[in-house]
Amino acid sequence: MIDFVKSRDTVIQKSFFEEFNSQNREMGSFAYSGNSESVWTGENITSIWKTILINETGSYCVAARPMTMDGAEFNLDLMGYSVSEDQINNDEIGIWNYISVAEMGGVLLFLSYWIWTCLHFSKIIFPAQKVICLYIFLFALNQTLQECIEEYVFSSECIKYRQFYSVYEIIDFLRTNFYRLFVIYCALGFGITRTVPKYLMIKGISIVIALCSVYWISLYKDVYVVSEIFDMIQYEVSPAIWVYSICHLLKQCTSVTTYENASKARFFRRMLNAFIFIFCASPMLHYLSNIIFGNFDYRLSVIIGDLFTFMEKIAFPCYIMFPTHNEALAYNRNVAEEAQEKMI
């Protein structure tokens, strides 16, 4: 059913529950101003938000209402799962907020520990291990924005939600592609056992920034075709990068002729095992998260999904690249150099 809601604001942006709750809105058949302009805007899975732009003050906005007059008794179909209003708007919501803050604090604490470790092993640190600090920072910023968006989705306090969500999308796109760039560079050994060629990192980051710029323009200008193309490319490119990295690591592990190469082989073998585990376990973890989402509390499923993401994106890369592993490489490199000098 279609209803008309009277408004005096130039921009109206309310939550799904407030729009459809009959107790919080004005009901009735109002006159519609033909000179006003109404625009419906949805943001991917958060299309429960709507922005209606009005040219003239005192005009009327079109809104939809459920068939039942009791707007509180309905389920929200969110990402294919039925979530009732009581699961999101309840008195115990503060507990989940504290848990979310604890998650962010844990990520920032882990970032601080990683920075301290890099400073402690500064003499034998790899360039790739310094880059991890930037990636963890992007991950923490991305998760923080995600938590803020989830808070604003079900409230009417966010006036510029669309711009806020675009910033989150760009940072998430940047973090994802930066992670893929880091994976392929590590698989090739750059910044670990091979020196980084001049301007190689700059070229890679420039490509990522250029892709982010095009993606941002597509979001800001509502070019959803470009967004869909980018999403399709991401889903196709990511498995290809993982498969190529795994194949290249298999090749690296076969070189065991000297002490140094033996140490490299152990290092790359550890990286190979982690890459295979992440590549195989990632779809299973996401599937398990979706099952939890459909059968348990919405907030609980989000927290478990964040835990899986932390293990996949942060814990395993940091385990592989932990600076204490550098001592074996440095030691065996010196042994190989001394053996070569004795032969000369």
Swiss-Prot record:
Top-rank taxon: Eukaryota
Position of the signal peptide: none
Spans within the Lumenal topological domain: 120, 220-222, 295-344
Pfam families (UniProt xref): Pombe_5TM
Subcellular location: Endoplasmic reticulum; Membrane
Broad class of the protein's primary localization: endoplasmic reticulum
Coiled coil: none
Transmembrane segments: 99-119, 121-141, 199-219, 223-243, 274-294
Topology within the bilayer: Multi-pass membrane protein
Keywords, alphabetical: Endoplasmic reticulum, Membrane, Transmembrane, Transmembrane helix
GO annotation, cellular component aspect: endoplasmic reticulum; membrane
Chain ranges on the Cytoplasmic side, renumbered to this chain: 1-98, 142-198, 244-273
InterPro entries: 5TM-prot_SCHPO (IPR018291)
UniProt family annotation: Belongs to the UPF0742 family.
Protein name: Uncharacterized membrane protein SPBC1348.02
Organism ancestry: Eukaryota, Fungi, Dikarya, Ascomycota, Taphrinomycotina
